[in-house]
Amino acid sequence: MIWAWLTLSSGLLNALWSSQIKSRVQKEGALTFTISMRWGVALSLLPFALFALKVLSAKWWFLSTLSGSLECLSLWALTRGARHDYYSTYALSNVTPIFSACWALAFLGETLSPTLGLGVVLVVAGALWLYYRGHWSWWGLLGAIFGSLSGLFSKMALPESGFLLHSCFAFMVGAFLLTVGGLKGRTTTVPAIARNVWANRILIVLSALSTVVFYAALQMAPLSRVSTLVRVNLVFGFLLSYFHLGEKHGWKARGFGAILLLAGLVLVLWKP
């Protein structure tokens, strides 16, 4: 069950750094913040990735490039959707486990027991209950689809390289594509990105740790389980918003969503 502890740790670390997103985005802008975080994580992992560097097949480079590109598309979709309706976009982006389970069944030969299937449904229901505000967001759904496909290709690439090489390269691909798009659209600048990499150094360390342990877990365990269990970050995020940020409006209704999530996570961990 090492993979489970790694996934839970990734969820906690993710919640810790992402709880600071709102204030940072308001100050720096969504795209500049996102790009600086991606470059920061990629560069912080680079020394370890170089140490683990070895000859890799063309298939690995193709799969890892696809993974990084699709993750970039997922972030782009979420950024677009958040401009119109942040909560609905974020809520629908968390239906990712459903798509991940479908890809795992179709392409990885994983099995989906009734217990695991119910766990996936409860986790997604809890995420929607926590954040959905009654408006449909195609951007959120697209973000979920792209994110789940990124996870699929990562799962395919990890056995050959290990988690350090793959995570570093995939993040670098995403950072490069986002930077090119941002510079072309004149929505960010290189000095702004560089300045924010340093300003966000603590968040980058937390995000890098979260990334490493997530991919380590994904290398060990089925995609359908890891993709669902990592949603524990939503529970940690709810607790941080209540106790640390003092966001107590509607906490009882949101708390029910957290309970659904926890029930689903227990089922995901359940081994018949």
Enumerate the predicted regions with their spans.
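Membrane-interface interhelical linkers
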Residues: M1-S69, L73-H84, L128-L141, M172-M220, ...
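Structural signature of transmembrane alpha-helices in multi-pass secondary transporters
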Residues: S10, V41, S93-T96, G143, ...
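Hydrophobic transmembrane alpha-helices of multi-pass small-molecule transport proteins
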Residues: G40, L45, F99-L105, P114-L130, ...
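Hydrophobic alpha-helical transmembrane segments in multi-pass integral membrane proteins
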Residues: L45-L53, S100-T115, S148-H166, S207-L223, ...
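Specific alpha-helical transmembrane segments that line the substrate/conduction pathway
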Residues: L70, T79-V121, S167-M172, L223-F243
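Conserved small-residue-rich
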Residues: G140-K184
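C-terminal appended segment following the main domain
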Residues: L218-P272
